[in-house]
Structure formats: C-alpha cells, structure tokens
C-alpha cells in the first residue's frame, strides 16, 4: 500500500511514522520550501503526544520534556493563592518535531511540495502538486493544519469561528530571569486570572532541546479579548502593513502592539509573570478559532488533526488529538485492507473525540474570557485529551 501525507508538521509526522510501521510506503509533502522551525513554542506534552517517541522510538521522556509538579496561581501582588500538587509535562514544538522527523527516512520527507488538488477513483487517488507532478497512492492523509486546503475543498461550508480572543505567546531564556522570578515560577505551571483574561507560564526545553535547569526557556501564553473588526484587524496587521489571517509570527508583530502588550503586562500582571512577558524579544500571536467538521473520511481521503477539528488550547490537547487520530488511523488500516472501509470505521470515533474536546475547550475559554467564573484549583481545568486528567 502507498500513502501520501500532506503536511509535514507534528500530526503529519505521526501519521507517516505509524503507517510506515505497519508496512505502508509513505511520503510526506510539506509546502514550505524551508525546514520547519520556530513554528510553535511550548506545548503540553500529554501521554498521546509522547506515546510514539516513548513506545516506538525508545526516547526517555526526561530527554524531550520538562516535568512540573505544581499548579500555581498568583494574585495581582504576586502572592500564591493556590498551589496544588499535579504533575504535567511540557515540551516545545521544535523539540518534538526534530525527534519525530529523525525517525523518518529523509528521502520520504519532501519540502517545497504544495498540494494543489487530487483526483480520486475507486482504486486510487492521484495527488497533484504545484510542481506539476503527480503521485498515485492508495491513501491520502490531509494533515495540512488550521488553514487546510483539503478541508476547504471537501467541506466548503465549514468556516473558522472566531472565539473572541487572541493568544499572545513568547519564550525567554530561563537564565535571563532574576532569582526571585525563577523562584516564583519554579517547578510549576503558573497562572494569573483577571477580568476577561488569563495568562500562564511554564518551562520548556531550550532552543537546542536541553532540559537542564538554567538552559531551558520560560514560555507564556496570554489570552486577551479583541473585538472582531477594527480591534482584531489592528493587532493582526503586521509590521509591514499586511493583515494576517491566523497568526502573526515572531518578529512580525507591529512595534506599537508589542509596546502596548508590554505596558499592560507591567500595569496589570503579577511581577514574576510580567517580567517574563517584558523580556521576550520576539512575541507572536495566534487567533483563537473553533473549527468543527461533520466528516473526516471521504473515500480514500481523510482529514487529520487541525485539518479536521481546531480546538482552543485550554486542554493542551491539540497535538495529542492529532497523534490520537494517527494512532487510530494506523490501527484501522492494519485491521482492514479496504481503505474506504477502514476510514469509515476510523472516522466515527475520531469525530466523537474531536467534538467533545472542542466543546470542553469552549466551556473553559468562556469561564475566563467571558463569564469570570474561573476558580483556581478546579479539577475541571486539568489538561487532558479525553477529559480532565484523561
């Protein structure tokens, strides 16, 4: 069997590796002409996200992630108002990407290969690429992310729904923080919640993947409301005057918005978290959208990860959902050699998983950004793919 995976990010790599492991001949087609770097910051490293690297690649968790043992909340003065025991693991997009990609044969990963379309028959799918070449395969896995070309073609009525807020993000070297700040944030994911907003900070591996204290990065995610229209358009207009759709990458956020963000941090956030925000040199931002799909399987073609459901980050489960989709896909293909039948069986469970995760992250987001009833220590807020802590 031959398969093409469109999209060379974490979801696409999981799909390619797991299909490869059951004997499928797989090629990954990534539209970016350059190696994917700086495409993400910190990620919650749930068991599903780590499973392939631990079970199949034998990579020790402590080599690719940072463990924290506390969930901590600070008030405006920087005093601890909640400090509960709970173990999380955090990694970085780059660390996980490098580890997964190292498991795939280099000749199977094709940069600068954008899919322009496909034509399907009962027996195969012909994938068309921008280079005017084509590939004939038995299975097409579309893992092309939030702005999925495949989703737009297969489900043209599905549109991103703006959640009403944006995530400001950034990372700073742990070693650049003063001792008091490091102590306040030590061994924890640290939150501050205030009216219609919240921010969290946690340690992740350093730029070279180091997990040694002092060589790591401190990552923050700050959710801030922007009215659709002028306010949102303004913050998404980059330093070159271009209005972005989904995110503004590091180094491209307009200087006036960076200055405003730092000013609000200094005026409104607890000092330890504010110092992290102020020291970040190249903050970036992503718009928070909901995307829900009614289908994920279309004959010999499927949507996987963010190409299907796009969920808010509050469960730290976006990467885990893509990995779970990939594991289930490989298991379905291994059980059933008829690809359309396998995809039909695979689809029902993944649709249910995506729908419950989307609804749960909507509820969590509403609690902080709209209703103001986010309670520190509430077990419903624990990260997890299938439910709090699950």
Please name every model-derived segment.
Residues 5-21, 25, 32, 141-142, ...:
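Conserved mid-domain beta->alpha element of the FAD-binding
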């Amino acid at each position: 069997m031959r398969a093409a995976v469109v999209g060379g990010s974490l979801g696409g790599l999981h799909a390619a590796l797991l299909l490869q492991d059951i004997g499928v001949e797989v090629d990954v087609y990534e539209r970016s002409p350059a190696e994917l770097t700086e495409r993400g910051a910190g990620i919650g490293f749930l068991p599903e996200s780590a499973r392939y690297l631990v079970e199949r690649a034998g990579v020790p968790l402590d080599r690719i992630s940072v463990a924290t043992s506390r969930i901590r909340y600070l008030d405006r003065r920087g005093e601890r108002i909640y400090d509960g025991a709970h173990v999380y693991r955090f990694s970085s997009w780059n660390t996980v990407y490098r580890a997964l990609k190292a498991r795939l044969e280099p000749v199977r990963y094709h940069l600068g290969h954008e899919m322009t379309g496909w034509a399907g028959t009962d027996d195969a799918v012909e994938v068309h690429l921008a280079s005017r070449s084509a590939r004939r395969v038995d299975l097409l896995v579309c893992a092309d992310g939030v702005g999925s070309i495949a989703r737009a073609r297969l489900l043209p009525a599905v549109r991103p729904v703006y959640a009403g807020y944006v995530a400001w993000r950034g990372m700073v070297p742990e070693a650049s923080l003063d001792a008091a700040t490091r102590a306040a944030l030590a061994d924890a994911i640290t939150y501050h919640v205030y009216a219609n907003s919240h921010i969290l900070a946690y340690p992740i591996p350093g730029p070279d993947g180091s997990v040694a204290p002092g060589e790591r990065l401190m990552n923050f995610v700050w959710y801030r409301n922007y009215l659709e229209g002028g306010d949102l358009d303004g913050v998404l207009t980059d330093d070159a005057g271009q209005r972005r759709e989904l995110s503004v990458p590091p180094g491209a956020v307009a200087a006036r918005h960076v200055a405003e963000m730092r000013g609000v941090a200094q005026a409104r956030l607890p000092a330890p978290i504010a110092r992290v925000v102020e020291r970040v040199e190249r903050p970036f931002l992503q718009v928070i959208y909901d995307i829900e799909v009614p289908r994920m399987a279309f004959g010999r073609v499927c949507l996987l990860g963010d190409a299907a459901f796009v969920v808010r980050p509050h469960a730290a489960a976006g990467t885990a959902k893509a990995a779970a989709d990939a594991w289930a896909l490989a298991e379905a293909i291994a059980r059933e050699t008829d690809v359309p039948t396998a995809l039909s069986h695979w689809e029902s469970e993944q649709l249910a998983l995506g729908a419950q995760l989307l609804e749960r992250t909507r509820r969590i987001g509403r609690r902080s950004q709209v209703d103001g009833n986010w309670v520190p220590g509430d077990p419903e807020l624990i990260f997890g793919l299938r439910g709090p802590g699950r």
